[in-house]
Swiss-Prot record:
Binds 1 lipoyl cofactor covalently. Belongs to the GcvH family. It holds the Pfam family GCV_H. It comes from Phenylobacterium zucineum (strain HLK1). NCBIfam families: gcvH (TIGR00527), PRK01202.1 (NF002270). Its cofactor is (R)-lipoate. This is Glycine cleavage system H protein. InterPro entries: 2-oxoA_DH_lipoyl-BS, Biotin_lipoyl, GCV_H, GCV_H/Fam206, GCV_H_sub, Single_hybrid_motif. The keyword Cell cycle does not apply. Keywords: Lipoyl. The glycine cleavage system catalyzes the degradation of glycine. The H protein shuttles the methylamine group of glycine from the P protein to the T protein. It comes from the Bacteria. The glycine cleavage system is composed of four proteins: P, T, L and H.
Amino acid sequence: MRFTKDHEWVALDGDVATIGITAHAAEQLGDVVFVEVPEVGRQVKAGDAFAVVESVKAASDVYAPVTGEVVEANEALSGAPETVNAEPEAGGWFAKVRVADPAELDGLMDKAAYDAFVANS
C-alpha cells in the first residue's frame, strides 16, 4: 500500500489500483454522511479531484493519486457512507483505476514514510 500527502491510499493489484482515504483522514473528517464516487469509464489524472466525501464537519475532495481509467466504483458507499469510517483502508475504498503509468506510484510514500508525515504535520 502507498500513500499520498493528501491522505489517499493506493493498493496495486496488477495494473489496477484500489484507492481510498486513510484512517487518519477518516478520523479527521469525523462521521462521514455522504460519498460521491467517480463514474466507471471516467479518465482521471493524478492530482485531479475524482470523488467527494462529506462529513458532519466538512466536505472534501478525494484526489486521484494515479492517472488512468476508473474500472470499478464502490457504489455501496452511497447507501453506507459510514463504511469509510469503519473500514477506511479496506471496505471503504472509493474506486479502482486501471493505471496508465505504474511509475507514478514510485513518488508515493510507504507506510513508514506516511506515518512519519502524519506525525510531523
